[in-house]
């Protein structure tokens, strides 16, 4: 077992032990983001005149897990970023400092899979001591963050969904991630100005942010791109239109459908409720601030026909939906130049999702293996180094072997070792052609 894997396993065990005893001792929660002035910009200069990645506010506090402060310093930055529509926004990132850093600082940008429509579930709130149901995911992720801190690396964790919790809006996730790194490198409070190596890592919702950051970096943030050593992603949402059909009628993941509709509506400032049935509108209202924890397994067998009016038999029959969802297909924003590790499950039946739909095929229950393979092959064709691993597991269980591979893979990238690639052995996948408008 390598040192990297040992650190990961140790981190998981320590976090599990800590979480089991810490909850009774958690202190009073801080104000939620919508009530906390730190999350708002009050400067006189219009945001549109401020460059993305500019630091607007800074505060320093202890890194909290389930409300308990740890002896780890967290620098939180409010910074300027960009919405899905290109509008100026503000967002928060958390920079966790290692207890002992040796030599030139190295940075791991960890993208959380908090998957929520509620801004109170974002990582920055959990890190500052906040407790919510959806925010339990960032608490558990401390098991993944701890090993990197123990290795002497700084960990940067952006609120990837932005201030409005724009669920599944991939390009916005990517910009929030890249701008958070610009801010972290520029802030005098973080001590990262001399950083030369940055690694990206994220699973599921975190993979959305990680992949889009990697593909947008060459054009949107070349200063960050020049420092990237690699990006590790797993459980990847490549083509959201395909995923909507894949999870339809499934036992565990069908509740993602209304969450995705809400996320697209919010990110693109469109109203999809006129196309919904009365039941669809009820779910829309019920889930407007829901996390994945409130949707997973709660709507078994849910279909599009239940959500939409009869005159809209498929999502593709709604022009405004088609126009927006086409913009969320991975690979349409550019090509990564940093090496990639991609892990994907392909036995979704374990989580109640059939793998026999035409043009879709097998997946992990929520993400589609054929889509991921096609994306990997496209990047290979553009000259990127890609290692693709496919597992006969579901989405939740794939995370285990993926982490065991991703941690040492990223460790090797920081060490300067040549990235492996298996482009020649990746099997063909699904077409990723945008829907005709």
Residue ranges and their predicted role:
Residues 365, 369-396:
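Catalytic histidine neighborhood in serine/cysteine hydrolases
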Residues 140-143, 167-189:
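Alpha/beta-hydrolase active-site loop
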Residues 342-350:
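Short beta-strand/loop motif that positions the catalytic acidic residue
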Residues 382, 389-392, 396, 401-437:
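Catalytic active-site module of serine/aspartate enzymes centered on a nucleophile-bearing elbow/loop
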Residues 182-254:
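Primarily recognizes the serine-hydrolase "nucleophile elbow" in alpha/beta-hydrolase
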